[in-house]
Amino acid sequence: MSERDEEPANPAPGTRRPGGRTARTRAAVRDAVLSGLADHGYPGLTVEYVADHSGVHKTTLYRRWGGLEGMVADALDMAGEDTWTPPDTGSLEGDLRELAREVVDSFSDEAASSAPTAFVAAAFQSQRAADALHAFYAERFGRCETVVARAVARGEAPPDTDAAALVRAVSAPLLLRVFITREPVDAALADQSAAAAVAATRGGAFARR
């Protein structure tokens, strides 16, 4: 690998600098990290692998990201920079059903599930990855505030409903099967999880405390 892939700047590990060559470098590293996590998991991911598959020199990787933890954390940061918005079906149960089915879609296909599964595994082995995963989902839960706001306006949920607690409750039965009992998940289970969460919401189970 040539030194041409090094960048002259010296930002802190994982620092975001938009545009041009830096953006391309960051995307290339992200893609290599995702590929490595999918193929080898966090324990098998190496700086050498990322360098070989991204075309970015090891010196640059260490200087900008500080090591593997920084690269994995930044890949999660980039995942949170998307334009995803929660569904708007016209009802709380419909919105939660769609959210639950997104979880099913993310983890029921082997190819699609490899990266998110590896991110979760990495969070058990790296505090920095765990912090990044927490931040990713906290931001996702924040976007789901609109689901609850619409439900409150329609009279489907109490005004003090905690959106994050509600979304966790919808996802929890699905993720239990994916990561703990290793059972399959499907649309029927997603719909069941949504219906249960709606019933609990109406009973005030997710009131902010």
Which residues does each predicted region cover?
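Basic, helix-initiating cap at the start of DNA-binding domains
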Residues: 1-53, 59, 70
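Solvent-exposed, amphipathic alpha-helical segments
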Residues: 28, 32-40, 95, 102, ...
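Amphipathic alpha-helical interaction segments
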Residues: 28, 70, 94, 98, ...
